[in-house]
Design a protein with these regions (language model features):
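Glycine-rich flexible loops
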Residues: 2-288
Length: 288
């Protein structure tokens, strides 16, 4: 039997939607550092950073206190991992809140010394919302040779990454080190850091970590293929062009394509706290 609509529930839902539309939605940039640090969005991002940090440690992409992770919170703030702490052991209170200039505005720990690298990426490319830097063995091995991994061999790698850039060596933590990625940030989401490691950017921390996995797996496969002693077979050029068409539709950068357009500011994420609150209110009213 067809279930009859509940007119009271419909009215409550309409009221909830009207409230959500009528209330001013504060953006992260409009909140104080303490308010944004304790916001629902910040809590969710901290959890994601912690989860990805442990994943990097489990995959042996970091050791000791190595590697760092960050993500943007609005346009003025950045959440980042602390210095001198294993990515295995992080808790929510350990994650630092910094402004876009690298000044700590909330949190009890000192920020990672390599945050300057992340900030240069954010300033140079508005599409970058999260950055993961680590030292996966096979990819780092390529950085020691001064040669990026070859291209045109595996379709998945071509779609998500393609040509990986190789930035020159500079002392980690310095402004000179941070600026080494600037020539590549527009057309590369994955950059090898000479004699150091890898940095990847994406729209989320999870996706930036995916790029790290894809790069490391690809570098490992290339090393194994070379050991077989047979010539490597490349994907035909016309098929690479098909991949580039797909890649542009998906919004992945590639040095073989024109730079992607800047993201539309109107497509910024909605305030998740307000949305959650309205849903809770509507749900409770419907239960009465």
């Amino acid at each position: 039997m067809e279930q009859l609509a509940n007119p009271i529930s419909e009215q409550v839902r309409e009221v909830g939607e009207a409230v959500a539309e009528a209330l001013p939605v504060p953006k992260p940039d409009e909140l104080s550092p303490s308010a944004i640090s304790s916001s629902f969005e910040a809590e969710a991002l901290r959890s994601e950073i912690i989860r990805v940090g442990r994943k990097l440690w489990e995959r042996q992409y970091v050791d000791g206190n190595g590697g760092n992770i960050s993500c943007r919170l609005g346009t003025k703030y950045v959440l980042c991992t602390p210095t001198m702490m294993s990515k295995r052991d992080m808790e929510p209170a350990d994650i630092c809140l910094s402004d876009i200039d690298g000044n700590i505005v909330a949190g009890d720990r000192l920020r990672t010394s390599e945050l300057l690298l992340h900030l240069e990426i954010y300033r140079a490319n508005p599409r970058a919302r999260a950055v993961v830097h680590c030292h996966p063995p096979y990819a780092t091995a390529f950085s020691l040779t001064g040669t990026p991994p070859p291209v045109g061999l595996i379709s998945e790698y071509e779609i998500f990454i393609g040509p990986a850039a190789l930035a020159r060596y500079e002392t980690p933590g310095t402004h000179a080190f941070a600026e080494t990625v600037l020539p590549f940030v527009q057309n590369h989401n994955t950059i090898l850091l000479a004699n150091h490691g890898v940095v990847c950017w994406s729209d989320t921390v999870t996706h930036a970590e995916w790029l790290t996995e894809i790069l490391e797996s690809y570098c490992k496969t290339c090393v194994i293929a070379k050991q077989i002693g047979k010539p490597l077979t490349s994907i035909p050029d016309d098929k690479i062009q098909e991949i580039l068409v797909l890649k542009r539709k998906l919004g992945f950068p590639d040095a073989r394509m024109e730079p992607l357009p800047a993201p539309d500011a109107a497509s910024a994420p909605v305030n998740r706290e307000l949305e959650k609150l309205v849903r809770q209110v509507v749900s409770r009213l419907e239960e009465r």
